[in-house]
Amino acid sequence: MDINWHITVDDKACVKAILEKQRNTWLVRDRYERNLAETKTHVTREQFWEQMVCMRLTTRARSGPGGKLDRFQCLSPFPLAYDTVCRQQSREAFIRSTLSTHQVGTDRIKISRELADNFARLEDREWPRALELCNRLTIRLGTRETEAELADYINDTFEGFGPKQSRNLPQALGLTRFEIPIDIRVTKWLNDEFQFPFKVTPAALSDRHYYKLILDAVCKLCAECDTYPCVLDAAIFSAQDKDA
């Protein structure tokens, strides 16, 4: 069964209004410069792992500019860098201690266990496939299908990465245009500002089929407005950060 989303003039006006208002914000500009760039930087183990850590930490945590998580992500050297974690005898304990020191992560015991498991899985057998799927998107602009293949791989392979987080990671790497993380900011905008035809809830979005249904609507909406979901996502994020 197919659902045919009908985009109205008012729908397009709502999207264009937020895009125009937020077009000069740093995050919208960053999406144009990185996610929409025709050539992208080759993804390394170090970059993939760092973003895996940071994106896992965003679950149920405020991640706007100036917060603890934002400051943690900007630290140089990064406290949980790939080479640093490699050297640890007890990676789970080291990750948990580091998260506690910097006061990031809503459930540090669970997050530490999942990240340690993911690190072991990458080291054991997953690095070739993970980097292949990422770097395929750096060679040429990906289709929505190739982006979705990467998101589904992350969702199926790594602990703590559901439909949203599995799209957060590649978007943070600058790889994706279509497959966006539909987080609480996006659902709030869809429900309150855009007036989506039915209420979109975070709980329902944990189901990958429901998630793809909502993302189908967002992709069609953006196509009709001559923009990309990653840009709309950035505009929504920027607008709600200002309102907070």
PLM region descriptions:
Residues 1-105:
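Structure-specific DNA junction-binding interface
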Residues 59, 71-78, 118-131:
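Basic/aromatic-enriched alpha-helical hairpins
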Residues 59-60, 101-102, 122, 172-176:
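Alpha-helix C-capping/helix-to-loop hinge sites
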